[in-house]
From Swiss-Prot:
Pfam families: GcvP2_C, GDC-P. The modification N6-(pyridoxal phosphate)lysine is found at residue 264. This is Probable glycine dehydrogenase (decarboxylating) subunit 2. Its EC number is 1.4.4.2. HAMAP family: GcvPB. The glycine cleavage system catalyzes the degradation of glycine. The P protein binds the alpha-amino group of glycine through its pyridoxal phosphate cofactor; CO(2) is released and the remaining methylamine moiety is then transferred to the lipoamide cofactor of the H protein. The glycine cleavage system is composed of four proteins: P, T, L and H. In this organism, the P 'protein' is a heterodimer of two subunits. GO terms for biological process: glycine decarboxylation via glycine cleavage system. NCBIfam families: PRK04366.1. GO terms for molecular function: glycine binding; glycine dehydrogenase (decarboxylating) activity; pyridoxal phosphate binding. Its cofactor is pyridoxal 5'-phosphate. Keywords: Oxidoreductase, Pyridoxal phosphate.
Length: 486
């Protein structure tokens, strides 16, 4: 139900009404509305009840198991929210002078340092405000590096077929031609295909390790040596860093640039479009091209902003100010609460949960896409057999899971696995929760055999039933408009 459907003529909330003297005559006539805005006429209680009711229908990490593959939907500690909301942080304006921002700048400086050490990079920039923007930043620096060397013929970016969809999109946005590298039958990058693709046109390769298949590529050092020998650079998509946090450093694998998703690995709230944070780290080659502003130590031990005047080869700023401050603070508090040993435990339990759940799913009769490999932090189940024999699809399983109180895993991604579920149980989930998920999947598998139509019509218990996805894609009518009788 839309809030407009509760609207009644003349119903208003006047507690916050402006004074009668609030004038509009200071505005030029051409900027004044000719007609009142089409807003719902509702009371304050109507508004509260409407949005409270909607919030109770949400699936979220605070209410449900949320095994959305490659999204790391882990618990967000409330201590991080509380401390990041201290008045000194909330009341600081982005334009506050450096001398009055030393506490905030100290937090950012320490976060830069911690993230650089955790990943084996020389330094970090916290400016990117999302994972995709972090990707763009990293690839833009690769382009700037080659252009600064006069290597303008390096116009090709290598991207595995198991990559996130943002990887080829980012490479294209930065002006590169994308060349896809296949995955071999065991889930690693096909080295023969890689070597054939390398040449003087190669700018670099974009990799996630562990990959979106949940598999750690055993040949990463060979890949790094081959790409570097060809004159290219290695970009690390940090989407799956949760699996190796504190255990393995991308810099030690040979990566030249990395982006992190603080809103995933470092446990800040995400979903619904934001907010995010995608810091980038670099080795020595790309250091001059890092975006600004960054935080540096000034003489006397204080902190200051580095600007384009300090970094003449920078690719420039990415936004009006400096990143999503609230997300950065929450991530800083998170790493300080955990410490190095705590971050190692994140990787331990992330991998443990993924491998336990994968084994339970296999024992329950589900087909793992790569049964010969150990899961990094997530794994892929293929329902190709069920689709062929029973006529039920990954979508049907996902919709039915909602009825049973579980958010669905990622479906139909990665694209190279047919009818797949990409399942990531973060480290904060208990064994009991994982067992309950397996029981739900077993129930759905039984229903698929006995009553497949039950799955095809799911969900049955939610306010919104099965949507017409074709119509929704073709008729993008998202704005409410009053009907004639209204």
């Amino acid at each position: 139900m839309l809030i407009f459907e509760s609207s009644r003529p003349g119903r208003q909330a006047r507690a916050q009404a402006p004074k009668p003297t609030a004038a509009t005559n200071d505005l030029p006539e051409r900027f004044l509305r000719q007609q009142p805005p089409a807003l719902p006429e509702v009371s304050e209680m109507d508004v509260v009840r409407h949005y409270t009711g909607l919030s109770q229908k949400n699936f979220s990490i605070d209410t449900h198991f949320y095994p959305l593959g490659s999204c790391t939907m882990k618990y967000n500690p409330r201590a991080c929210h509380t401390l990041a909301s201290l008045p000194g942080f909330l009341e600081r304006h982005p334009a506050t002078p450096e001398a009055m921002s030393q506490g905030f700048l100290a937090c950012l400086y320490e976060l830069q340092d911690i993230l650089a050490k955790m990943t084996g990079m020389q330094t970090m920039s916290l400016a990117p405000m999302a994972g995709a923007q972090g990707e763009f930043t990293g690839v833009a620096m690769i382009r700037a590096y080659h252009e600064a060397r006069g290597d303008k013929e390096r116009c090709e970016m290598l991207v595995p077929d198991a990559a996130h969809g943002t990887n080829p999109a980012t490479a294209t946005m930065c002006g590169f031609r994308v060349r896809e590298i296949p995955t071999n039958p065991e889930g690693d990058v096909d080295l023969e295909a890689l070597h054939k693709a390398l040449g003087p046109q190669t700018a670099g390769i974009m990799l996630t390790n562990p990959s979106t298949l949940g598999i750690f590529d055993r040949n990463i050092q060979v890949i790094a040596q081959s790409v570097h020998k060809a004159g290219g650079l290695l970009y690390y998509d940090g989407a799956n860093l949760n699996a190796i946090l504190g255990k393995v450093k991308p810099g030690d694998m040979g990566f030249d640039v990395i982006h992190l998703n603080l809103h995933k690995t470092f446990s800040t709230p995400h979903g619904g479009g934001g907010p995010g944070s995608g810091p980038v780290g670099v080795g020595e080659k790309l250091l001059p091209f890092l975006p600004v502003p960054r935080v540096a130590r000034a003489e006397g031990g204080s902190y200051r902003w580095l600007t384009a005047e300090d970094c003449p080869q920078t690719i420039g700023p990415l936004s009006a100010w400096m990143g999503n401050a609230g997300v950065l603070l929450r991530a800083y508090i998170y790493v300080r609460l955990l410490g190095l040993e705590g971050m190692k435990r994140v990787a331990d339990f992330s991998a443990l949960n993924a491998n336990y759940l994968a084994q339970r799913m296999a024992e329950a009769g589900f087909d793992l896409a790569y049964p010969m490999r150990r899961a990094g932090h997530e794994f892929v189940v293929t329902l190709k057999r069920q689709a062929k024999e029973l006529g039920v699809t990954a979508t049907d399983f996902a919709k039915r899971l909602l009825d049973l109180g579980f958010h669905a895993p990622t479906i139909y991604f990665p694209l190279l696995v047919p009818e797949c579920l990409l399942i990531e149980p973060a480290e904060t989930e208990s064994k009991q929760t994982l067992d309950a998920f397996v029981a739900a999947m077993e129930q759905i598998a039984k229903e698929a055999q006995e009553n497949p139509e039950l799955l095809k019509q799911a969900p049955h218990t939610l306010p919104a039933r099965r949507l017409d996805e074709v119509k929704a894609a073709k008729e993008l009518d998202l704005a409410w408009k009053p009907t004639p009788h209204e």
